[in-house]
From Swiss-Prot:
Species of the source: Escherichia coli (strain K12)
SUPFAM superfamilies: CRISPR-associated protein (SSF117987)
GO biological process, one term: defense response to virus
GN (gene name): casE
InterPro entries in UniProt: CRISPR-assoc_prot_Cse3 (IPR010179)
Subunit structure: Part of the Cascade ribonucleoprotein complex, with stoichiometry CasA(1),CasB(2),CasC(6),CasD(1),CasE(1)-crRNA(1). Interacts directly with crRNA, CasA, CasB and CasC. Stable subcomplexes of CasBCDE-crRNA and CasCDE-crRNA also form, both of which are able to bind target dsDNA, and CasCDE is able to form R-loops. CasCDE and CasCE complexes have endonuclease activity. Interacts with YgbT (Cas1). Binding of target ssRNA or dsDNA causes a conformational change in the Cascade complex.
One GO MF term: RNA binding
The protein's name in its UniProt record: CRISPR system Cascade subunit CasE
Amino acid sequence: MYLSKVIIARAWSRDLYQLHQGLWHLFPNRPDAARDFLFHVEKRNTPEGCHVLLQSAQMPVSTAVATVIKTKQVEFQLQVGVPLYFRLRANPIKTILDNQKRLDSKGNIKRCRVPLIKEAEQIAWLQRKLGNAARVEDVHPISERPQYFSGDGKSGKIQTVCFEGVLTINDAPALIDLVQQGIGPAKSMGCGLLSLAPL
């Protein structure tokens, strides 16, 4: 697995959908590949473009669209019981029935995704997503401004939350799987990358 600092050209970083498309340019000659990278926007709207932290299964290659500033290969050696600092930008949501009673193609009432607004609900969502892999010891969720996107004839917004805190490892292989797969929805919109560091 690779961790990279990347700058996406301004023309490709106007919204999250474009940014995601720009990141694909770092992995040429893979037109049919499934997405095997996660990212976290660190700085937007700088003169050179958008600064991104990228986690990927393949080593990224600089292009005219995206420049790789720094890359390092990462191998996790996690131990049960060890506390770690963590950071996660996520899209904590719940699914509810459409209050306007609109129907889907099967005649069932549509389900809608809505953001979790209350801090206690956000923390409970995070612990559910971590499952038995880790226990949250301390966390500070910070609700961010809505993120807007458009592409493929669709547009929308997501409500992101930045979680920062301390967790304790319960199941090292399960936690590594979560790091590699990402946590929660909207991974193509810059959510789900779980960063870990020693205390």
